[in-house]
Amino acid sequence: MSSLVSNEVYDVESGLRKVIESAKANFCESVDVAINLNINSSKSDEQVRGCVVLPKGLGREVRVAVFAKGGHLEMAREAMANIVGDEELIEEVKKKQCKLDVDWCLTTPDFMASVSSIAKILGPKGLMPNPKFNTVTFELAKAIKIIKSGQIRFKSDKTGIVHAKIGNVKFSIEDLLENFNAVINAVKQCKPASIKGLYFKDVFVISTMGKSVKVENLNN
C-alpha cells in the first residue's frame, strides 16, 4: 500500500475526491479500496473471500472463458463469452498455445473433472472455476451476464487486507461511491463467525499510482 495522505481521516466522498485529484499519471488509473481486517489470516476459518457485482461496472470489458462441451459451447458463444472450448482448448492451455487473457473462467459441473487437469495453471491466476462463485454451473448464460455486468472477486491477503477495484479516475464520484459501498457490504457479509468484535480496522481508497487516503471506519 502507498504512503498515507497525512494522518487525516476523510469521509468516503471526500476521500474519493482526494484520490482523483492526486491521480497524475498519463494513463487512466484504477481506483481501489483496501480494507484492513481484524483477522488472523493464518487461520483458515478467518480467511475472507467472496465476489460482488459492482453496480456501476469496472469501466472496461470483463473477459470470460468457458470450458464445456456439446450444447453448452453454443450457449456460451451466444452469451458473448470471449473464449470458448472443450478438451481441445484444455490441451491448448496445457501446451501454452492459448493465452487465457480473461478475468473469469467458467465450466459446467459435468466438465469440472476435465478442467481440474489444468488447476495448477488456472489456480495461481485466480481463474479456477469455483461453485462458491457460481462459476461451475449449467446456467452459463445467466452466469456470464452477471459476470460481464461487473462482477469482481476479493480475498484477504496474508496481512489481512482485502483489495478490490471499484472503477477508475474517470468515474463520477457518485459511481465510485456506489461501487465502494457494494464492496464494503459484500466484505461485511463475509465476516468470519469467530470475529466477535471489531472487524474493519482501517479503510483506504487509492489510485494506481497515487497515495492512499484513509476514510471513515465503516464497522457499523
From Swiss-Prot:
Alphabetical list of PANTHER family matching this protein: 54S RIBOSOMAL PROTEIN L1, MITOCHONDRIAL, LARGE RIBOSOMAL SUBUNIT PROTEIN UL1M
Family note: Belongs to the universal ribosomal protein uL1 family.
Gene Ontology MF term list: rRNA binding; structural constituent of ribosome; tRNA binding
PROSITE patterns: RIBOSOMAL_L1
Keywords: Repressor, Ribonucleoprotein, Ribosomal protein, RNA-binding, rRNA-binding, Translation regulation, tRNA-binding
Pfam families: Ribosomal_L1
InterPro entries on file: Ribosom_uL1_bac-type (IPR005878), Ribosomal_uL1 (IPR002143), Ribosomal_uL1-like (IPR023674), Ribosomal_uL1/biogenesis (IPR028364), Ribosomal_uL1_3-a/b-sand (IPR016095), Ribosomal_uL1_CS (IPR023673)
Species whose genome carries this gene: Ehrlichia canis (strain Jake)
CDD domains xref list: Ribosomal_L1 (cd00403)
Gene: rplA
Repressor listed as a keyword: yes
SUPFAM superfamilies cross-referenced by the UniProt entry: Ribosomal protein L1
One term under GO cellular component: large ribosomal subunit
Name of the protein in its database record: Large ribosomal subunit protein uL1
GO biological process: regulation of translation; translation
Main function: Binds directly to 23S rRNA. The L1 stalk is quite mobile in the ribosome, and is involved in E site tRNA release.
Lineage: Bacteria, Pseudomonadati, Pseudomonadota, Alphaproteobacteria, Rickettsiales
Protein origin, superkingdom: Bacteria
Subunit structure: Part of the 50S ribosomal subunit.
